[in-house]
Swiss-Prot record:
Transmembrane annotation, as ranges: 55-75, 85-105, 124-144
GO BP terms in the entry: proteolysis
Location within or outside the cell: Cell membrane
EC number, UniProt record: 3.4.23.36
Catalytic reactions of this protein: Release of signal peptides from bacterial membrane prolipoproteins. Hydrolyzes -Xaa-Yaa-Zaa-|-(S,diacylglyceryl)Cys-, in which Xaa is hydrophobic (preferably Leu), and Yaa (Ala or Ser) and Zaa (Gly or Ala) have small, neutral side chains
Source organism of the structure: Bacillus cereus (strain AH187)
Catalytic site: D111, D129
Name recorded for this polypeptide: Lipoprotein signal peptidase
Keywords: Aspartyl protease, Cell membrane, Hydrolase, Membrane, Protease, Transmembrane, Transmembrane helix
InterPro entries attached to this UniProt entry: Peptidase_A8
Family classification: Belongs to the peptidase A8 family.
Primary location class: membrane
Amino acid sequence: MIYYVIALFVIAIDQISKWLIVKNMELGTSIPIIDNVLYITSHRNRGAAWGILENKMWFFYIITVVFVAFIVFYMKKYAKTDKLLGISLGLILGGAIGNFIDRVFRQEVVDFIHVYIFSYNYPVFNIADSALCIGVVLIIIQTLLEGKKTKE
């Protein structure tokens, strides 16, 4: 199914980008891409977003395995008839597995995309995080649009 190819693409790009960061940048170093907006910063995270639940790897292992199983089940059941849902779930699946690979093999997640939004220093993130967020946003948009159609 094409949605698994999307997940594999996300995993590949995520893992290659993280490998490049680990091999070519010292932890904590930063390269400006757009001054005061976008940087490539070598960072590690032993928890979830904003460092929540730091060093609770077994929790993340269990949650991720259950979550991935749910996503695969949901994809098999609903993605055949709903392309946008399939794409969204493919992005979410790829993102979840990308960060899971880091947690299993590194005991931490490699983050490197560092954004400043106006004066807010947004937490450093990675390709897997981006795919997860985009997938969730697409599902929310689809849900809102379907809700609007139902009301009409």
